[in-house]
């Protein structure tokens, strides 16, 4: 089902998943959003979320723009969420910069369950 969605459909789908988990969700503008697709808030903590739909592994460059992007929003944390997986360079970069990474397995087990 997710594989057939376009980017906008996937972002809306993820927003609904967050809403069902009790988050307040605010979608950012489609253009000029600094790689941040939505802000999610729960218990006073705001997370800037980048939603990446991909058929291949995501690398460092795929997650790096989120570090810069979160500075443009009132967010405490940042997350990259994908229907795919991350390579080791993305994982290392995220660890260094305090980014949360959600891959296909985590998406299926923690958000879609």
Residue map of PLM features:
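Mixed-charge (Asp/Glu-Lys/Arg
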Residues: 1-113
């Amino acid at each position: 089902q997710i594989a057939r969605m376009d980017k906008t459909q996937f972002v809306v789908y993820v927003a609904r998943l967050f809403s069902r988990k009790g988050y307040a969700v605010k979608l950012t503008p489609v253009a000029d959003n600094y790689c941040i697709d939505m802000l999610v808030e729960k218990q006073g903590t705001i997370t800037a979320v980048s939603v990446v739909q991909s058929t291949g592994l995501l690398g460092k460059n795929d997650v790096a723009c989120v570090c810069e992007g979160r500075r443009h929003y009132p967010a405490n944390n940042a997350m990259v969420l994908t229907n795919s997986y991350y390579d080791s360079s993305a994982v290392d970069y995220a660890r260094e910069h305090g980014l949360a990474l959600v891959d296909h397995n985590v998406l299926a087990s923690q958000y879609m369950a």
